[in-house]
């Protein structure tokens, strides 16, 4: 029975054989590696991946697709919403310390998935995701560009990232209205030891009104926190490099510790 793509899951299925091969080559799976695929769909990537790996764990929310995938002897199927999956437990079950994570992420929840995975970065070796190209542009953007924002800062803090492949709409069934691309994400070995919640709040405040100078947003927020050290708020959020946001978060944490003693 033919599976009909469900709009509520944001399903677009990859059907171009040459493109599938190029994506699998970019991922570079090797026999015995512990890999998890998010949203395998109709197994376009799953089949060539499992042929190279020998075994693959897949996370699929769609009940019909999960049932179909269970018939494959080399697949371990987790039927779940990926946002509820504990990747540390998955690594434990696979008796490994590091997972490779791949997937053609549903466009409507790609950002929440990326933030969810941040919680499990210690058990992740690398990530390869197909996403809307516009999302990847935001992930890898540098300061002083329109694409630079909260996503850029939060992800660049923890990952080295690159856009490795462009995937045109005609590679899919049904074709999406947007261009897609594949991003490679490799966790930094020694990221800045910043409090993630504090950084997230700081960056959210900074980018809450992109067009305004930071003194209207971040400046006031820093004042409320009783922080009076040097930080140039006579510029816009997009003009501040990642390293400066990290340095500010570190100083803020030290300041609030000192204030509470």
Swiss-Prot record:
Species of provenance: Albidiferax ferrireducens (strain ATCC BAA-621 / DSM 15236 / T118) (Rhodoferax ferrireducens)
InterPro entries linked to this entry: KsgA/Erm, rRNA_Ade_diMease-like_C, rRNA_Ade_Mease_Trfase_CS, rRNA_Ade_methylase_Trfase_N, rRNA_adenine_dimethylase, SAM-dependent_MTases_sf
Sites where the protein binds S-adenosyl-L-methionine: 12, 14, 39, 60, 81, 104
Pfam families according to UniProt: RrnaAD
Family listed: Belongs to the class I-like SAM-binding methyltransferase superfamily. rRNA adenine N(6)-methyltransferase family. RsmA subfamily.
The EC number(s) this enzyme carries: 2.1.1.182
Xref: HAMAP family: 16SrRNA_methyltr_A
Catalytic activity: adenosine(1518)/adenosine(1519) in 16S rRNA + 4 S-adenosyl-L-methionine = N(6)-dimethyladenosine(1518)/N(6)-dimethyladenosine(1519) in 16S rRNA + 4 S-adenosyl-L-homocysteine + 4 H(+)
Any one of the GO CC terms: cytosol
GO MF: 16S rRNA (adenine(1518)-N(6)/adenine(1519)-N(6))-dimethyltransferase activity; RNA binding
Enzyme class: transferase
NCBIfam families assigned to the protein according to its UniProt record, in alphabetical order: ksgA
Record gene name: rsmA
Subcellular location: Cytoplasm
Keyword annotations of the record: Cytoplasm, Methyltransferase, RNA-binding, rRNA processing, S-adenosyl-L-methionine, Transferase
S-S pairs: none
Classification of source organism: Bacteria, Pseudomonadati, Pseudomonadota, Betaproteobacteria, Burkholderiales
Name the record gives this protein: Ribosomal RNA small subunit methyltransferase A
Domain of life: Bacteria
Record's function text: Specifically dimethylates two adjacent adenosines (A1518 and A1519) in the loop of a conserved hairpin near the 3'-end of 16S rRNA in the 30S particle. May play a critical role in biogenesis of 30S subunits.
């Amino acid at each position: 029975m033919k599976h009909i793509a469900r709009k509520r899951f944001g399903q677009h299925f990859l059907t171009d054989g040459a493109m599938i091969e190029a994506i699998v080559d970019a991922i570079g799976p090797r026999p015995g590696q512990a890999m998890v695929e998010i949203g395998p769909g109709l197994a376009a990537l799953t089949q060539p991946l499992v042929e190279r790996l020998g075994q693959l764990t897949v996370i699929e929310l769609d009940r019909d697709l999960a049932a179909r995938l269970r018939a494959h002897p080399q697949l371990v199927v987790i039927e779940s919403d990926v946002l509820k999956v504990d990747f540390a437990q998955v690594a434990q079950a696979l008796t490994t310390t590091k997972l490779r994570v791949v997937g053609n992420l549903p466009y409507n929840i790609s950002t929440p998935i990326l933030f969810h995975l941040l919680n499990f970065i210690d058990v992740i070796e690398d990530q390869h995701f197909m996403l809307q190209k516009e999302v990847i542009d935001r992930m890898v953007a540098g300061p002083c560009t329109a694409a630079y924002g909260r996503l850029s800062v939060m992800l660049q803090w923890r990952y080295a990232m690159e856009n490795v492949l462009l995937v045109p709409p005609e590679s899919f069934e049904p074709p999406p209205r947007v261009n897609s691309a594949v991003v490679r994400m490799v966790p930094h070995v020694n990221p800045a030891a910043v409090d993630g919640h504090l950084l997230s709040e700081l960056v959210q405040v900074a980018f809450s009104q992109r067009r305004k100078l930071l003194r209207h947003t971040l400046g006031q927020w820093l004042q409320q926190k009783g922080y009076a050290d040097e930080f140039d708020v006579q510029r816009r959020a997009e003009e501040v490099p990642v390293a400066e946001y990290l340095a500010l978060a570190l100083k803020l944490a030290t300041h609030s510790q000192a204030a509470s003693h």
